[in-house]
Amino acid sequence: LPVLRKDFIFCDYQIFESTAMGADAVLLIVRILDPQRLANLIQLATSLRLAALVEIYTEADIETAARAGAQMVGINNRNLTSFETDLGRTLKLLPLLQPAQVAVAASGIRSRRDIRHYQAHGVFNFLIGESLVRSENPAGFLKMLQGETNDVSE
């Protein structure tokens, strides 16, 4: 599995640090970065062969991400103010992405059914954190999400 540094990244040092730690990708959150800083961090990450997963939540965030050069866009299903999750958010915002951008459904994915629903709509990339961490059997949970088993305990 690829290693994503999921943190509040806001400076160049953290990008270099991510490389040193062996990360394959970094999470850059549109809401906490000004547009120029976002663009600079994407460029730096790319130059260091790190994938930049740019997290968005609103239509305005999509515009900012596109202008900054985001190629991989994580659509956060979780409202970071209320912490409510809406799995429909990804599908609502998906048509607004540029054709060359890769969509990642992020937050609230808990079952193979959720995965299949997104795949039926053309989303094949997922950021799964909380459900995996809370699982008593993370390996079994991943197998279940991938359709290798119906039972998390296997």
Describe the predicted segments one by one.
Residues 10-21, 57-68, 105, 109-128:
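Catalytic cores of alpha/beta
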Residues 17-37, 74-83, 123-141:
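Glycine-rich phosphate-binding active-site loops on the catalytic face of alpha/beta enzymes
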Residues 92-96, 119, 134-154:
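C-terminal helical cap(s) of enzyme catalytic domains, especially alpha/beta-barrels
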Residues 1, 20-26, 46-50, 67-74, ...:
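Glycine-enriched alpha-helix->loop->beta-strand junction motifs that scaffold or abut catalytic
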Residues 5-7, 30, 54-56, 77, ...:
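A cross-domain feature marking catalytic cores of carbohydrate-active enzymes
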Residues 4, 83-85, 91, 101-106, ...:
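Active-site-adjacent loop and "lid" segments of alpha/beta metabolic enzymes
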Residues 66-91:
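Glycine/Thr-rich beta-alpha phosphate-binding loop at enzyme active sites
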Residues 1-53, 61-64, 90-93:
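N-terminal active-site wall of soluble small-molecule enzyme domains
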